[in-house]
């Protein structure tokens, strides 16, 4: 009998804390989208596009980028050699982004150096939700060129 009383009292206390509004359901984060990768011989080109709101303030500051849901960052790296022993290659990156309505933006790409690493970064503005197609032309030092195209979806955070 005493066991039932303690159980009933415990349930009553637990339920007393349930009187407020139910918490809002969590908004699921959009799934992480993989980087786009292109291999040409022993050269690997990797491109990543993400909303700058996902960057930490420190990273955004280091990249010289304003954080925001509607600002998308394109990060491109050109590497040569076997994985884990790759060296950065200088290149000229030309990039455009096109949304589903056919609106096209040129992305101004700039060099981003960190130690021995060399990447290229640029931003574009978008409306949300949106699907963006990225078209890149990569011209490596020495004149070899290649293209890359990939699509990513972006949602309000």
Spans of features found by a protein language model:
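Short, solvent-exposed, Trp/other aromatic-anchored flexible loops in extracytoplasmic proteins
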Residues: 110-135
